[in-house]
Amino acid sequence: MTHKLTPMMQQWHQCKEQAGDCLLLFRLGEFYEAFFDDALILAQNLDITLTQRQNVPMSGIPATCLDGYVDRLVSRGFKVAIAEQADNTEGSKGLVPRTINRLITPGALLSSSLLPEKANNYVLAINQVGSLYGLSCLDLSIGTFLVAEYDNTKDLIEAICRLAPTELLSHAKFYQKNEAVIKQLQQHLRITLSEYVSWAFEYQSATKKLYTCFQVSSLDGFGLQGLVPAINAAGALLSYIQDKLLLPISHLSIPKIYGQQKHLLIDKASQTNLELLSPIHGEHRKGSLLQVMERTSTPMGGRLLRNTLINPFYDLKEITLRQDSVEFFLQQADLRKILKRQLSCVRDLERLATKISTSLATPKDIGTLRDSLLSCTHIADNLQNCALPEFLENKFLIAPPLCSLIKTLSTELIQELPLKVSEGNIFANHYHPDLLRLRNIKENSKSWILEYQERIRNETGIKKLKVCYAQALGYYIEVASNLAPQLPKEFIRRQSRLHAERFTTQELQQFQDEVFSVEDKLQTLETKLFKELCFYIVEHRDLILKLSTAVADLDYVVSLAELAAEYDYRRPLVDHSDALSITKGMHPVALTLLDKGTFIPNDTVMHSAQTRMILLTGPNMAGKSTYIRQIALLVIMAQMGSFIPARSAHIGIVDKIFTRIGAGDNLSKGMSTFMVEMAETANILHNATDRSLVILDEIGRGTSTYDGLAIAQAVVEFLLFTDGKKAKTLFATHYKELTELEMHCQHVENFHAMVKENSGQPIFMYEIVKGHSKKSFGIHVAKLAGFPLSVVSRAQQILHQFEGPDLRPEPEKAQQLVMF
């Protein structure tokens, strides 16, 4: 027998159907309740009590704590729908109407504590038409709108990994057809999958949505002609944001084609291996190149640094412009110090502009914008008389309309602004003629109350009589219970307390009506003025965003100059040659982790006409991996326009960096350690060019010695002799046989990590010198790792037998085993 649903639960089911796969928070009075499976999820993830009523599981959170709890849910990858109840101001009986007015997902955040300050927060839509893939992504918090198109899944996955969205959107058929793509993305990214109706991804629906959003009749002006899959993804994404999530899209910038400007390409594996954004072991930045380079003072500058780190420049002009600016500020220590202080006062102009454009801004946000814009004018004043490098020329010439806005915000607003419009006290008295008049009436009400209280005390003879105010009662007169009979008959009883009585009078009631009327008028006026001010600011949004870009650029180069000053970095010569020459180079991360002066610098000299490949041998723990990573990191920093930790450097522009470092099973894809190694190496062989930099560490370890050696040598020969694939390569290996290639190929040079011996014990020098290593010292490393001494001793015996005339050691007699 099924229970008949109550009207309220019928209402909940209707909302739940609309919410789809979102967790539904259903407003009931002063709480948001969850039912059935949602209640269980809520209780488990928020550590709140799970109860039940009539066998229906339920849990709830106070309405006053909603935002904090929602942030916790979204941070764990949940999508949340909020069903609000309509105002019941008229006190009508019956069921209060409830509708979903908000859906919150990880990728579609306009304003939230979850938004990373110095990184983008993208929601990305993906679509397939034939063999072509189109993608579109949005950062709603700043209005960035990107589209792209790819003809293979490899480039598609690499692009998505670089963008690192927190939410992926497509339709059911795409997810079913591209399970392998989704699995690869989930392996690299922490991403929430969202599904949307397939018709939104059709060309007619998508173009209609784009036309409506940008008020155009053609997309050719955006450069999107012919990009059908990308257009389909873009239109569907707009529909999802506006029609499904009920969020505004009017603030979005016009769609730009992602990847049009050529960059130094660093695939996801290399980003991970080189620890650009985070160390391999741990999700936080500590120990990453980003953590070392992060000296920015603004959110915009921080986002620019992060994006440039994984997308360094390929255009020599872009690199040189930034190098010139870094050099300028490196020589201007006093100016740099002043600018750092002023930049630290500039808040997130992009996200503030978005909040104002989408009617989410509070008065305090307007105050933050005002203070940030004022700081920008101070920055402009300090740069005014400087002979700025070309990169910054004219960027801080603040347009007259923006100057007028800044003046308005500076002179017409009260200094300390409230969090809510309803609190009032936003505008200066002179901003509107009615403001001062209404405020005077409100202010005079306080003195009227005091005068009225004193008058009726004298009239009644009750000296302890008080005139008070309470939210529920309004203004009232309070006297002790035993004195209440002394009051005149015109005093009207309002409330009885334990030891007091509360009254009102016709005069007090009339005063209250007038005061409340004034407060209502004042709140209505300030609300109207606040909306008008926001519209005025929105009219200047493009100018604010242009200034925001200038601030980001300035912050970027000033922070790099600060970094160079702190660690005595030098300017590398970057050009179109094929040189890779570094004198006294150092690993930028290791340099910060060691005591000053203890890191051993090393030289590197490579040139396509001479040394194209370095074969690096030496024992583990001697610094081989640090050295080869170091070269890649210095190239990346140089092509960011940064100075680098080296005495000098000459770097010909690199188009791609590939790394094959370390080993690890990929269980989710059913791939062994060796298979992962081979797949990543295959990617390098297919995609490297003559201008690429390839870092290979221990290729061929996961199979038999001869198999591994054969593969390693074949890879070396391919990169040495195949036209179009002659990349500069640093190859760290334990295969001594490979070092013989130096005798047969002029483009190969042997280097090794130097080790000295003292009484048979190795001393690692961490110097990279010419020639190949004679010993690997693996047993010594095993001893340092804590091997039992008996195992270490036996390994030494076996090693001596290997090195002797009999190359096959006999098992110890006491330990001999019958082998099959």
Swiss-Prot record:
Role description: This protein is involved in the repair of mismatches in DNA. It is possible that it carries out the mismatch recognition step. This protein has a weak ATPase activity.
Residues bound to ATP: G618, P619, N620, M621, A622, G623, K624, S625
Organism annotation: Chlamydia trachomatis serovar A (strain ATCC VR-571B / DSM 19440 / HAR-13)
GO biological process, one term: mismatch repair
Assigned protein family: Belongs to the DNA mismatch repair MutS family.
Keywords for this protein: ATP-binding, DNA damage, DNA repair, DNA-binding, Nucleotide-binding
GO cellular component: cytosol
Highest taxon in the source lineage: Bacteria
GO molecular function, one term: mismatched DNA binding
Protein name: DNA mismatch repair protein MutS
The keyword DNA damage belongs to this UniProt entry's keyword annotation: yes
Upper classification of the organism: Bacteria, Pseudomonadati, Chlamydiota, Chlamydiia, Chlamydiales
Xref: CDD domains: ABC_MutS1
